[in-house]
């Protein structure tokens, strides 16, 4: 959705932007907008892309999943995820403010500060789920699809995907 100069700087700019936001949100609720054929006929270019798009496919086809938790350094994986239409939130969890700022522009992505490097690999899944429950994003009994890299703290190394119950 794009504004022309006349509507963007007219007498009622706030009302115009509000009406356009309502129209965009309404369009995204249409069933056609919730399914995607993005890259359906092409091969993946990297393991990271395979995980990102497979996670979206899995989450969209498993009704108990209430969102995706993506542990990220640079934000590449949640950016790839946002290219697929979905009614599910993509929680981009990062310890880097610059990454979170960039991800704020991606459709369906909720950027959240989370210093996952502060946790041991054994505690990471439980702490991530706990963080999202405490933030009011998830409830007990939900499922969350989580992506991360097996080598914690390295950018561009997303290679794990898990579906976790929220206990």
What are these regions, as identified by a protein language model?
Residues 19-55:
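Long, charged amphipathic helices and adjacent flexible linkers at domain junctions
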Residues 110-113, 126-131, 158-167:
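Beta-strand/loop-dominated core regions that host nucleotide or nucleotide-derived cofactor-binding catalytic loops
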Residues 7-30, 162-163:
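C-terminal helical cap(s) of enzyme catalytic domains, especially alpha/beta-barrels
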Residues 1-9, 37-41, 84-88, 110-116:
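Short beta-alpha connecting loops at secondary-structure transitions
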Residues 3-5, 27-40, 65-66, 139-142:
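Flexible, glycine/charged-enriched surface loops at secondary-structure junctions
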Residues 5-9, 39, 72-76, 93-98, ...:
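Short, ordered loop/turn segments at secondary-structure junctions
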Residues 79, 85-124:
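Nucleotide-binding motor/catalytic cores of P-loop/tubulin-like NTPases across gene-expression machines
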Residues 49-65, 124-136, 142:
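Phosphate-interacting basic helix/loop segments used at nucleotide- and nucleic-acid interfaces
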């Amino acid at each position: 959705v794009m504004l022309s100069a006349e509507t963007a700087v007219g007498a009622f700019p706030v009302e115009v932007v509000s009406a356009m936001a309502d129209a965009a949100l309404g369009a995204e609720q249409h069933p056609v907008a919730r399914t995607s054929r993005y890259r359906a006929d092409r091969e993946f270019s990297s393991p990271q892309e395979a995980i990102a798009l497979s996670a979206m496919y899995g989450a969209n086809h498993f009704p108990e999943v209430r969102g995706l938790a993506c542990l990220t350094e640079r934000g590449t994986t949640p950016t790839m995820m946002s290219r697929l239409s979905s009614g599910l939130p993509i929680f981009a969890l990062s310890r880097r403010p610059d990454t979170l700022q960039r991800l704020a522009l991606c459709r369906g992505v909720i950027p959240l500060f989370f210093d996952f490097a502060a946790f041991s690999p054994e505690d990471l899944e439980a702490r991530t789920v706990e963080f999202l429950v405490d933030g009011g994003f998830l409830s007990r009994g939900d499922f969350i699809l989580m992506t991360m890299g097996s080598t914690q703290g390295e950018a561009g190394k997303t290679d794990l995907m898990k579906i976790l119950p929220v206990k």
